[in-house]
Amino acid sequence: MVVLNQTIERTTLSNLVANEDYCRKVLPFIKSAYFNVKEERIIFEEIHNFVDKYRKIPTKVSLEIEVGQRKDLTENEHLKIVEIIKTLDNANVDMDWLLDTTEKFCKDKAIYNAIVDGISIIDGKDKNRTPDSIPSILTDALAVSFDNAVGHDYLLDSDSRFDFYHRVEE
């Protein structure tokens, strides 16, 4: 039996399948590595694959079918996943709070995973990367943000840019 405690991971999964606006805003920034529980990670992967392929959010039924077609699950894992999927309901939460909390969750998980990766590099368990790669791993983790404004929007910022360019300097 799956414990039905509400965590940010479960709240995120619930809203990914129930709230299309939320899904479109956060899905590009969430990685499967942010989910520690294997069953939740698999559900996220299936949601991500479905949205990539069909450009809309999946139903719980379609998720159950997709999970049922996977060959890498034991019967016990499959049953746990189906049970979790059945609990995914649209929690009535404030959208701003949900976005802020999801962003903090992603930042915290990215930093945690970067530190764990750094430790495995230092311990010699990761043979593909050297200790010189640790700063870039941590930099990438610290850069996790839902803010996708990376410059000027030449149409929306035109008034402020016009004023800036025509300002008389003293």
For the regions a language model picked out, list residue spans one by one.
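Noncatalytic partner-interaction/assembly domains of nucleic-acid and motor enzyme complexes
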Residues: 1-105
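The Walker A/P-loop phosphate-binding site
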Residues: 14, 147-170
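Short amphipathic alpha-helical patches
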Residues: 35-36, 67-71, 121-126, 145-146, ...
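Interdomain "pre-motor" coupling segment immediately N-terminal to P-loop NTPase/helicase cores
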Residues: 89-157
